[in-house]
Amino acid sequence: MSSETLGGRPVFRLAYQTPSSWAAMALQDPLALLSDHAHCELKAAITAQALVAKNPEHSSILHSLPRVAIEELEHFERVVQILEERGGKLEPQASSPYADGLHKGSAGTRNNLLLDRLLLAHLIEARSLERFHLLSKEDGDTELQELYSDLLVSEASHRALFINLARELFPLDKVTTREGFLRELEGRVIEGLAPSSRVHSGPPA
């Protein structure tokens, strides 16, 4: 994982920086967090597969995103295994105010669906990377520290892949402008969410 640092903490180029206290709040219910995390991995795999299925004419998508889908499913299996070993179970998928906010907030100004999907995937991976970094540094649960530390490299790789695909397939000025708009939207959405034991929850009250 490579990123800039500010005061010793990585900067993930997000409009809103999650406070360090978020990790302790999210870990108050580790089973709920793990169940939600597993669903995040599953949805990420589905997103990668859908991008391939709907855009097979783009060879860069066709040949890069299947590997992302496989990696996300491997992460899903690992998280579910830890969840079950702790006596928990995968709960039914709940609605995601985070994803809903991103898609509803971007729909009215959207000019190209593929561009938005790539950029939103990039931003979601960036936010997940930031949250996993915080969880990997939170004392008290060595197993989860190891889990989230192990996932940082792949999350950073996926984050970079999605923005690079956007830059390859669309004019750079268009990508830069739209990414800036969506980055600000993402920051507003997640800052306004309620606190909970979910990967993409709001800050502590």
Task: Locate the predicted segments by residue.
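Non-heme di-metal
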Residues: 1-205
